[in-house]
Regions:
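Intrinsic-disorder/low-complexity, polar/charged segments enriched in Ser/Thr/Lys/Arg/Asp/Glu/Gln
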Residues: 5, 34-36, 68-70
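Core SAM-dependent methyltransferase catalytic element
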Residues: 70-76
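Short, low-complexity, intrinsically disordered N-terminal peptides in bacterial proteins
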Residues: 1-4, 76
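Amphipathic, hydrophobic secondary-structure cores in small proteins
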Residues: 8-63
Length: 76
């Protein structure tokens, strides 16, 4: 069963803003909580997985819907 999920909508912002908002959400989230980041800056496709690897978080899912990227990330 999946745990709770927090949505971070960073559409309309350029990197590094989506990554900074993701960091803030992960820092505040209890362990085991997933954070879904929505971004439309193509650089997020590179920045977000790199950031997740740096902090030891797991990228559970990456999807594209038009120009919107959706990342599901969890840090245990």
């Amino acid at each position: 069963m999946a745990g709770p999920e927090i949505i971070v909508d960073a559409r309309g912002h350029r990197c590094p803003v989506p990554t900074l908002r993701l960091r803030r959400a992960l820092d505040k989230a209890p362990p085991g909580t997933s954070v879904r980041l929505l971004a439309d800056d193509p650089m997020a496709q590179i920045d977000v997985p790199h950031f997740a690897a740096q902090i030891g978080a797991t990228v559970l899912e990456v999807t594209h819907s038009g120009a919107v990227l959706s990342f599901l990330i969890r840090r245990d």
